[in-house]
Every structure is written in C-alpha cells, then in structure tokens.
Amino acid sequence: MSEVIKSISVDGREIKLTIGRFAPQAGGCVLIESGETSVLVTATRSSGREGIDFLPLLVDYEERLYAAGRVPGGFLRREGRPPEKATLTCRLIDRPMRPLFPNWLRDDLQIVATTISMDEQVPPDVLAVTGASVATLLAKIPFKGPMAAVRVGLVGDDFIINPTYEEISEGELDLVVAGSPDGVIMVEAGANEVAEQDMIEAIDFGYEVVCDLIKAQKELIAELGIEQVEEAAPETDPTLENFVQERVTDPVKDVLARFEKDKNVRDAALDEIKESVKVAIDELPETDPVQVAAVENPKAIGKVFKSITKTLMRRQVVEDKVRVDGRKLDEVRPISCNVGVLPQRVHGSGLFNRGLTQVLSIATLGTPGDAQEMDDLHPDSQKRYLHHYNFPPYSVGETRPMRSPGRREVGHGALAERALLPMLPSKEEFPYVLRVVSEVLSSNGSTSMGSVCGSTLSLMDAGVPLAKPVSGAAMGLIKEGEEVRVLTDIQGIEDFLGDMDFKVAGTADGITALQMDMKITGLSMKVIAEAIHQAKPARLHILDKMLATIDSPRETMSPYAPRLLTIKIDPEQIGMIIGPGGKTIKGITEETGAKIDIEDDGRVTISAVDEKAASRARQIIAGMTRKLAAGDVFLGKVTRIIPIGAFVEIAPSKEGMIHISQLADYRVGKVEDEVTVGDEVVVKIRELDNRGRINLTRLGIHPEEAAAARAGGSES
C-alpha cells in the first residue's frame, strides 16, 4: 500500500493518520499523531482455534521511555513489566473494540499500540483507541465499526475536547467517551462530584466529536477502496438446536419463574436441566442426526442452552418487569455493613455485603516514604493513595491457580481508587500514604462497587478524614428491539446475559467515578441518561446503610498506626540533616527509632508508632536547623571535658562550651566536680562570637525555661 496521510481537525487540534509507511507485514497499521505524541497501532489476524467458545482478542499497549527521551532505570536499563497505566490503557482499547467483533469469530486477533513519541501535553490513550479502529479496518477483519474515542474535560463551565495534562489536573472531570455509528459504546470517568445532568451533557458533547472521527475513518477507507468485511456466522445444526429447545425451554422457564434469591440454588437447577439434555442425547443411537451433530460440535449443547436461558431471562424482564430473583427493576439487594471487623493490628477494616457479594477492605496508613514511584511516561510521578483489588477463585466457588493480579483486577482496583480520590484529605492536612486492599470474599456481581463501599468504611474506621463518604452501584440493561429496561444493582447472571455494565460511584452531592461497558454495538443518549439518573437513588440508599454503621471518621487511630509529625526547614539545610553518607540522619533514626522522610521543598515528616519517639526526633531536627540566638535554652549532653570547661552538644553536629566560671553561681574548683561526660544539662546560649563559636552558661535560667527544655522544646 502506498503512503497515505489524512488530517482531521478536532476542536481546533489536528489528528494525523499515516498509513502505508510502517509495519508492512501487519494486517493493518496506522501511525496516529496529535501534537508531538505519536502512537503506532497494528491489528493482525491469524487462523482460528479449535474447541474454544470465546473471541480470542489480545490487546497490548506498550510505552517506550525513549518516547520521552528517557533511559529506563534498573540494572538492565530496559522496559520491564508494563506499569499499571499501560494495563489500564489496554483495557481502554479492548472494551469498546470487543463488542464490535462478531461473537462467533474464533480467529486469533491481536491489537498492539506502541507510544513511540510523547510530549507533556497530549495523552496517548485516546489516540490508541481510535488507532485500533483504523488498524482493524485496514486489516479487513469482520468489524462493526468504525469506532473512535475522545477525552472530555471540564474547566470552569466549559467542556474541552482532548484536554492537555494540565487542563485535566485543573478541571473537575476526566471523561473518555468511545462510540460507534450505533451510539456510545464505552465511558470511563473520574470526577470531582460532577452533577448527573452535567455528566450526561459531557458524554453527549464527547459523542458528537466521536461521530466526526467515525465519519473521517469512513472517508479514509472509501478513499483507499477498502470494503468492510462481512463473513457468514457458523450455524448450529437445526436438528440439535430444536431437540435441545424442546426439552429445556419449559424447565428453564419454571426455574426462572421461581424468583430464587440464592444464586447457587438457581445455578444448580439450571445445570441439572443442561445435564439432563446431555444424557438424553447420549442415549440416542450413534447414527441419530442429533447425536452426530453433538459429537461433531461438543460445545453446541451449551451454546444453545445459554441462548435459550438468555432469551427467557430477558423476556421475563422486558415483558413482566421482574428479575430472576424477584426484585423490581430499580430495587437494590439487601445490604449490611460492619467496621472494625479485624483486630487493631490492621489500621482500619470494613466489611460490605450486598446480596451474595461480600467485600472485605483493609486500610493501612503509611509514611510519605511509602508513596509509589511511577516509572512511566506520565507527569504524575508519585501516588499517595493505592487501592488493590483481589478476586480469589473461592469467591465464585471455583478452583484455579492464584498468580499475580490480572488486567481485570488491576482495572477494578483502579476504578475504586478513582472513586475515592477526590474525597481524600490533602497531603498538608493528612500526610499519610494510604493503601486499601479489597478482598472479594464472595462474588455475585458489582464487586468493584462493593470495593468502593468497603474502601470508604475501612478508611473511616482508620480515622482518615474523608471530605465525604463515597458509595457505588452497578446498573444493567436489557434491550430487546425498541424495548429497553434499565436494571439497578445487577447480579452475576444479569451481567452475563445482559447488554450493559454501568458502574456509578459518588457522594451524596455528585459523581466521582463512572465506567460503562457494552455488549451491544452502541447505546442512545436517552438510555444513558436514564441509567445515570436511576443510579442516584440506589447510591444514596447504599450510602444511608453505610452511614448507619459509621457516620464519620474515627477520632482516634489504631495504636499500631504510625504517628506523623512534620517540620519545615530551609531546603539548604537538607544536607546538614542527612550528613555525610547519611550518617546524621541514620544517627537520629537509631537514637529515636523514628523514620524520617525529607522532601525537596524542605518538608520533613517524622513517623513512629511511639509518639514520644517521633517528638524526640523532631526536637533533634528542630535543634539542628534552628537559627541560634543568645538567650536560647537547650537540654544538651556533655561530650568532653577540658580544664577550663565542658563541651555540650545542644543538637546533632552543634556543640558549645561552658566555661568553668559559667557552671555554677559559686567558685568551681574542677569541672569534673559539676559535670561528667554523658550528663544531660540545661544550658543557655550566652554568646555567639564572630567566629561562629557558641558560648554557653548554666546561670540565669528561669525554672520555666528549664522545664520546657527538659520537656522536649527550647525557650528563647
């Protein structure tokens, strides 16, 4: 293919597509650029796999540090495991792409997006999403696109398309909208208590620009003479399909009509029906067409059974407006909350139950040195709030190897983290690093929103002064023709057989996080608005249940949580605190048992489980960095004695001398008669001479000054 370049204007900024220059052996390749950010995206298809019942789509997103002119750290000086941001971008690409592939497709598909140049203005993620659509169209893969994505920011009262990093940090909203010709297909947002109506308008605003990008892709494909591929779906043998349908339709209908609230009982009943039809087929003669079809396609029975169950469940919701567990469309499952469920060795804990979904969240208060350093291309180099989500196999009654967190766990953890972020206290107000781990102990839908609720409970139990508590609910959708039903607080089967998973988190006053995924090719703004508005009473209902358990953060922290004290010093004094080779700071740590973190701006944070240890370390640092003046009083230690006096350390690396005549208000014959090495003595600065020497005295010190010095401070 010869080289083709197409430019698209998006809200006054240019997006450039370059085709035919790179990766000639990939199925499709595009270089998508905006500003100095460039992302190379490829899509490739290989032959199908036997015996699988899912779409084997693999999405990889790579960030090369050369893109920002940097050399990787570490011994190997090479990029290693993808950072969390890369994993989240993989999901951002995958989620709007997957519904647009035919659900019968079993060929291996791989989309690889590589950021090869990046400035500090344009985020590469939405470029990668749009680039994935272009590359797939070029690869002539069956695909119901085009698809495109944009980011929407809110600064003041104005929506901004594809805001810069600076505009994102200054704004109240960071929203990504992806869509197809059929409607919105994916939404991802973090927000600072944005009102429901404002969020709806932002999504609509973004989708209008998405439509422009879709139009540009169609024009490009037409110019290149590429026609979108349509392939016939493989058909299930009609004889087998009819056999299964006749035997399972009524029994499945009966199970669904019981409105069984216990998922396990319902699943067992459905499994029994499926097994009975398998037994019936096995008993047929080997030459029977149904038996032959089942042997040729072993997964066909399960496929047909799922299709029948899906149709009946959806019909029940659409026609009768009743769900499989008997709930109304807008009804939330029973909720219970507990805090302080673990011993105080953990700093805070919260247990959140919603139906059969159970999440245990544990909060840990760390020191500033526990902040996570982010070695990636993005401007934020540190994280002081971490949320980790774990989904063990026993939570769904299964067995499987337990390895490192998968993309789903990383994504769910990041969503719950994002929901709480705007409500966390500032670093100045509460200098702790915060980590919450959410353990999913039982899953029947909406575990990510359960993690939001559990995180709030555990942080409040730990004494973290949240601005406001946050709760969340997951909304679902059943769409049959023109009939649409929005479901509140979906459970597993409704997620599995439904069309949408729409998670909304926020406070009583607005939305803080949003995530929408579709299984259909797009959704109208009318339905999205209905889902967002319907989520609010559910969130508030859940919030009321949480506040009935704990209505404000605890006033006292766990006795095992570190106590933090801060002191501000002149940045030029940092070297003095650290000392040669770290000798001074190590000495303070060894003497007091406190941990000391120093920032470039001179903020010193001292932490220790024992508050007295932290106070002692702060006293030492304050003494070292204090500008000395005549009349200041200190508690010092005698370090050496000479015939004419004694040297006293009043702070690390700061010594003064008491002349023998200043040891007492009477004549002293020998210095040793008054003090010995190691004695702690209260002294006052008598004079600072022009050579920087400190002359001390024990005379003329008021009792109040002496008491203050011994108590840990110094008076002037």
Curated annotation (Swiss-Prot):
Its cofactor is Mg(2+). Its main location: cytoplasm. Mg(2+) binds at D495, D501. InterPro entries: ExoRNase_PH_dom1, ExoRNase_PH_dom2, ExoRNase_PH_dom2_sf, KH_dom, KH_dom_type_1, KH_dom_type_1_sf, NA-bd_OB-fold, PNPase. Residues 631-699 form the S1 motif domain. One of its GO terms (cellular component) is cytosol. It catalyses: RNA(n+1) + phosphate = RNA(n) + a ribonucleoside 5'-diphosphate. It is found in: Cytoplasm. Residues 562-621 form the KH domain. One of its GO terms (biological process) is mRNA catabolic process. One of its GO terms (molecular function) is 3'-5'-RNA exonuclease activity. Pfam families: KH_1, PNPase, RNase_PH, RNase_PH_C, S1. Its EC number is 2.7.7.8. The keyword RNA-binding applies. Keywords: Cytoplasm, Magnesium, Metal-binding, Nucleotidyltransferase, RNA-binding, Transferase. Belongs to the polyribonucleotide nucleotidyltransferase family. Involved in mRNA degradation. Catalyzes the phosphorolysis of single-stranded polyribonucleotides processively in the 3'- to 5'-direction. NCBIfam families: polynuc_phos (TIGR03591), PRK11824.1 (NF008805). This is Polyribonucleotide nucleotidyltransferase.
